[in-house]
Amino acid sequence: MNLKLRLIIMNFLQFAVWGTYLTSMSRYLGPAGMGEHIGLFYSVQGLVSIFMPTLFGILADRYVPAQRMLALCHLASGLFMAAAGAYGLSAGPSVAFGTFFALYTLGVAFYMPTLALSYSVAYSLLEQGGYDTVRDFPPIRVFGTVGFICSMWAVDLTGFQTSAMQFVICGALGTLLAHYAFFTLPNIPVSRDVERKSFVEALGLNAFRLFRKRQMAVFFIFSMMLGVSLQIT
């Protein structure tokens, strides 16, 4: 299979996983008696994004090929999301917030690193194949947005917006992507000679130095505000 087509499928599934529940889970949480906790379900995504991508990024750089780490994260995330959905379906109106939220949080914790890993995999494979990442990656990434929209519509048209089934679908797509990444994507060798970094550098905290540049500071501030508004809407 052509490398670009492989990456298109990967990006499509990557964001299709997210689109199954991101815009619709509040319609399930409210009637299920968890309406007052909806904010927590969205905010925990940002919380785990602070440290989980860094931890798995370090592992992918040094010990595990990036495409395998991507597969393992999606497999874990898919299983936890499917478990959350299955629990919600079986519990019905008596679903316990603590149990459901714990399963959901674990699913999100393993999904968030895959956003950065998917970009790393795509860039590495394009470079290995002799492609220009600046020119060739954007058309591939567009299919991620297409995947998000398609899965969002699918959940809407099937009437699963108000059901825990949306999390089961999320888990199924995540598991599918895990198998796809593990068995079809080319291998990305790990870097054995990665230079040792300080704790600050390993966590990427040195990036805050960019705030010294006015243009970058304005860009980051408005990006954060945009991220907040996206979660609210």
Task: Name these PLM-found stretches.
Residues 105-143:
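Cytoplasmic helix-loop-helix junction between adjacent transmembrane helices
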Residues 166-183:
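Symmetry-related core transmembrane helices of the 12-TM Major Facilitator Superfamily/SLC fold
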Residues 51-65, 158-160:
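Helix-to-loop junctions at the C-terminal end of transmembrane segments
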Residues 1-49, 215-223, 227-233:
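Helix-loop boundary and gating motifs at the non-cytosolic
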Residues 1, 184-220:
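Juxtamembrane intracellular "pre-TM" segments in multi-pass secondary transporters
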Residues 75-94:
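C-terminal ends and interior cores of transmembrane alpha-helices
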Residues 61-75:
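Cytoplasmic membrane-interface "Motif A"-like loop-to-helix N-cap segments
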Residues 12, 80, 93-116, 224-225:
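Hydrophobic core of transmembrane alpha-helices in multi-pass small-molecule transporters
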